[in-house]
From Swiss-Prot:
Record keywords: Cytoplasm, DNA-binding, Sigma factor, Stress response, Transcription, Transcription regulation
Induction, as annotated: Slightly induced by dichromate, partially dependent in itself for expression, does not depend on sigT or sigE. Probably part of the sigF-nrsF operon.
Matching InterPro entries: RNA_pol_sigma-70-like, RNA_pol_sigma-70_dom, RNA_pol_sigma70_r2, RNA_pol_sigma70_r4, RNA_pol_sigma_r2, RNA_pol_sigma_r3/r4-like, WH-like_DNA-bd_sf
Protein's recorded name: ECF RNA polymerase sigma factor SigF
One Gene Ontology cellular component annotation held by this UniProt entry: cytoplasm
Superkingdom to which the source organism belongs: Bacteria
Region annotated Sigma-70 factor domain-4, chain positions: 123-170
Motif Polymerase core binding per UniProt: ranges: 51-64
Biological role stated in the UniProt entry: Sigma factors are initiation factors that promote the attachment of RNA polymerase to specific initiation sites and are then released. Extracytoplasmic function (ECF) sigma factors are held in an inactive form by a cognate anti-sigma factor (NrsF in this case) until they are released. Up-regulates expression of 4 operons (sigF-nrsF, CCNA_02834, CCNA_03001 to CCNA_02999 and CCNA_03363 to CCNA_03366) in response to potassium dichromate (K(2)Cr(2)O(7)) or cadmium chloride (CdCl(2)). Overexpression of sigF leads to higher expression of its regulon.
Gene encoding the protein: sigF
Stretch list, region Sigma-70 factor domain-2: 33-93
């Protein structure tokens, strides 16, 4: 766990327990991280950067109860920031690719739970072959729905429906595994 992750997580936990000073400090520290994250992705738009920082901090505040304190805070906050950035680009119809190495400094260094990975492998294995192939092609390999559908011998629309059903079945299986 990084020093920033440790500090942010401790501040947010104290904030959730009612320590408003710690909560404010945690949001301020997160704001600095978010500003740097958005600046790397938003060249020439400092006003947009500030808007995104504020939107993300507001979303973190409003959705703080959804954060599982047993998990990484920075990974959760990064997901919120990423969705806010995607929403921003959609509003402006901007498409950009983000190199993975840009995310390394923000991501937590916690290793994934091997039990979860094993359960996910089991859940994938329980799917019918076509659904398993679609999940692998679209979500793991990065093929488009049209490409994955062509590989499976079905239309893009049928691939979309089959993928949706597969992901729904996986989510249900994982929920049942959590107890």
């Amino acid at each position: 766990m990084t020093d920033t992750e440790t500090r942010l997580k401790a501040l947010m936990l104290r904030g959730l327990d009612g320590d408003t000073a710690a909560y404010r400090e945690g949001l301020a520290l997160l704001g600095v991280r978010l500003r740097a994250y958005f600046m790397r992705r938003m060249s020439g738009a400092p006003g947009d950067v500030e808007d995104l920082v504020q939107e993300t901090l507001l979303a973190v505040h409003l959705k703080r109860s959804t954060w599982d304190s047993a998990q990484s805070f920075t990974a959760w906050a990064h997901a919120v920031a990423r969705y806010k950035l995607i929403d921003h680009w959609r509003r402006r119809k901007i498409r950009q690719t983000l190199p993975l190495e840009d995310h390394v400094d923000f991501l937590a260094d916690d290793a994934p739970d091997p039990g979860v990975a094993l359960e996910l492998d089991r859940a994938l294995a329980s799917l019918p072959q076509r659904q398993r192939m679609l999940v692998s092609d679209v979500k793991l390999t990065g093929l488009s729905l049209a490409e994955a559908g062509a590989r499976a011998g079905i239309s893009e629309g049928a691939a979309k429906v089959a993928l949706h059903r597969a992901l729904k079945a996986l989510a249900e299986r994982m929920r049942r595994a959590d107890g």
